[in-house]
């Protein structure tokens, strides 16, 4: 069968939806490789797309035997549902943050967003063994390449980003339109941690953000500043429940109760 021509976004970086010229699965799937075709994936997406993704990888002439590891940016079903199947086919390892390991290994449907009863979402979440735990400052070797691990919590408490040269595989921290990954207390979200992670990204000298959803984009400090400012307002809004740190209206109400203020 004819091989596919590789369509890298950057040297040694292929995004498989971009390679296919269409959305194949629920998230971006980054293939990082060295000159000797040692390779790794950051995320895999849904289980029903694994066969197609692996066929694309095969047609790109990356030997399955040279898959170093499967890396989870975080333990959300749209990122990692296919890990168990891919790991079995590739006979490789799974790498993630320690806080992401438990839901991955237990197949926790609630923690991974596979089960959202109120919205009638009921997805399978096959458990998968995690062999490698990494945290901030660690390195993941992919043949001759090396990814620097950043712990960037906020969307989830176990979310990781990965630096390669001037690139940051940035997970669900920030998207090109200024949106961020869902904020949900049940999910381990923290607005304060989100802000800290975004400030770290802003202060860094990375040039490109490679998010887990949507197009790759050049780091824009004004966009990050605007997003941080928005998140800072979330800290004081009842809309975000226990993810907020206070609700100023309650202080105002206390004062008005003491004053005996009548409705206006």
Residue ranges of predicted features:
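Conserved beta-strand hairpin/beta-sheet module of binuclear metal-dependent hydrolase folds
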Residues: 4-60, 161-171
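Short Pro/Gly-enriched beta-strand edge/turn motifs at strand-loop
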Residues: 9-17, 117-122, 144
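Divalent metal-coordination and catalytic microenvironments
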Residues: 12, 32, 43, 53, ...
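Residue-level marker for buried hydrophobic side chains located in beta-strands
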Residues: 40-42, 71, 94, 169-170, ...
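Metallo-beta-lactamase
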Residues: 46-48, 139, 146-226, 230-237
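Active-site HxH/HxHxD metal-binding segment of metal-dependent hydrolases
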Residues: 46-51, 58-139, 229, 233-237
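C-terminal regulatory/interaction regions
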Residues: 240-264
